[in-house]
Amino acid sequence: MINGIINLKKEAGMTSHDAVFKLRKLLQEKKIGHGGTLDPDVVGVLPIAVGKATRMIEYMTEAGKVYEGQVTLGYSTTTEDASGEVVARSSLPAVLTEELVDQTMTTFLGKITQTPPMYSAVKVNGRKLYEYARAGESVERPRREVTISLFERTSPLNFTEDGLCRFSFKVACSKGTYVRTLAVDLGRALGVESHMSFLQRSASAGLTLETAYTLGEIADMVSKQEMSFLLPIEYGVADLPKMVIDDTELTEISFGRRLSLPSQEPLLAAFHGEKVIAILEKRDQEYKPKKVLI
């Protein structure tokens, strides 16, 4: 059995499920999953768990993400991104400066509440929102709280001849954040219709785009029996606090016993040497093995 983490660079035009399906065929391994869905049009880091590493998926999914994208001010779309139909157009504000944009972006830092876009996979009454949208039906959408730790402009404002304004941005956010909704809400705060015109995920669960492999690159390596794209299982807990345990504590964990450890973190990745051996969960004043990996 193959075990490990793959830092996959998902390309545009495929779903996250498509990527997993292709890897199952390529590696001839059924036990494969991904750690955080990417929309079909979005490129970037898609953490993949193989074999025993699939037990780490929930922690990879919960980890923070970093995205780089582009906002277009001047019109909104049905999907809140460039793939949708134009809903409304508006003139740019009389005063639109980089200082104003930067100042407005800072108002989104910290915990904010979002309304998921209609074209999303969020379920309401057992149906996905995009199913309602395609049927022309409206439904009340559940609001959700997310955390934005970074939201900054990364390019000058680019004013076009047809009355639009575009600029690039970078955002670091919690699980469940809709970046296209963030782009729309930013436009609303600036008093103008807007949408997200480009997006890529540049980091997720400690994995970065610079070291990611495309499916084509992985296929080429597999054909040469080269497996260096497969990372150790430890990469699956990169975002969890780390606790190194001794031999006695290792024995206690192997029997499922609780430990008293100097930490207040709700979850710990327990390491013995360089190997992760368990995920520990705080219960009262002790840590109980939640997942034992030895």
From Swiss-Prot:
SUPFAM superfamilies on file: Pseudouridine synthase
UniProt keyword terms in alphabetical order: Isomerase, tRNA processing
Active site (UniProt): 39
Enzyme Commission no: 5.4.99.25
GO biological process: mRNA pseudouridine synthesis; tRNA pseudouridine synthesis
GO molecular function: RNA binding; tRNA pseudouridine(55) synthase activity
InterPro entries: PsdUridine_synth_cat_dom_sf, PsdUridine_synth_N, tRNA_psdUridine_synth_TruB, TruB_C
Protein name: tRNA pseudouridine synthase B
Organism the protein comes from: Streptococcus pyogenes serotype M5 (strain Manfredo)
Gene: truB
